[in-house]
Amino acid sequence: MKIVFMGTPDFSVPVLRRLIEDGYTIAAVVTQPDRPVGRKRVLTPPPVKVEAEKHQIPVLQPEKIRDEAELERLFSFEPDLIVTAAFGQILPNALLEYPKHGCINVHASLLPKYRGGAPIHQAIIDGEKETGITIMYMAEKLDAGDILTQVTVPIADDDHVGSLHNKLSEAGAALLAKTIPPLIKGELQSIPQDDQLATFAPNITREKEEIDWRKEGERIYNQIRGLHPWPVAYTLWNGKPMKIWWAEKVSSPKKEAPGTVIALEENGFLVATGDETALKVTDLQPAGKKRMLARDFLRGAGSQLSVGSVLGGQDGS
């Protein structure tokens, strides 16, 4: 049986690697084009391309998978099954209908919850205690195909996008390994999604990154870890954005205005929120500076920060 694998970021790599380890013939890998990365805009291949080339697997990098010429190239590999994991483009119907065993997708949520491009971020931001992996048939509508298998993955209180991403990626690879054999034998019964239960996790926008200190401390904490290590939550200090890489929840009976610095400690500073849960900022990045520990910030660039200083807007927003 020949498989074409379609994926792009780090999340996709363990999935591809597991297919290779399980002995499937990977006829080709389809991924996004190389993109400029970093301040120096260095042209960088997607992680999936790097992994595929280690195993001498042909790599296709179409700008638009819907282009007729790109589809013909893909059809030339005659896949019996197409597996996608965070590919980044919606597949056209002509491609969905081509493989004998269909096109299946590894999605990082328990569908129909969190359809879209940022399900890991959004689950943490929303304070979920669990999420999971769904393997489903693909449809032209985003993340709306019939469900084949699912597995639940708990979210710890100190999980962030990076740690949960790694858990889900490995869980996705393991679930796929269990799903393919009964799928190709015709032993799996798919289940349609209930669109009325669907929630959405669109890509993160700049507006979602700014901290509103008027919110409850728990919600801000979830926002910080739901944006770590990318794109990172931020607040304003002296009118300039300061990234908040990490913070800890601290019970505080003080009733200072949200955004007010209420204490300086050896390893961080406490900021008032909209309730009695303050946040101790321990890891940050001032505008124009490198990421640093809060204790180093307080000794240097942040020496002007004091009890009573206000982060964010004048009202903590």
Swiss-Prot record:
GO cellular component terms given for this protein: cytosol
Gene Ontology MF terms: methionyl-tRNA formyltransferase activity
Keyword NAD appears in the UniProt entry: no
Amino acids binding (6S)-5,6,7,8-tetrahydrofolate: 109-112
Keyword terms: Protein biosynthesis, Transferase
Catalyzed reactions per annotation: L-methionyl-tRNA(fMet) + (6R)-10-formyltetrahydrofolate = N-formyl-L-methionyl-tRNA(fMet) + (6S)-5,6,7,8-tetrahydrofolate + H(+)
UniProt keyword Transferase, yes or no: yes
Coiled coil: none
Family annotation (NCBIfam families): fmt (TIGR00460)
Family: Belongs to the Fmt family.
UniProt-recorded name of the protein: Methionyl-tRNA formyltransferase
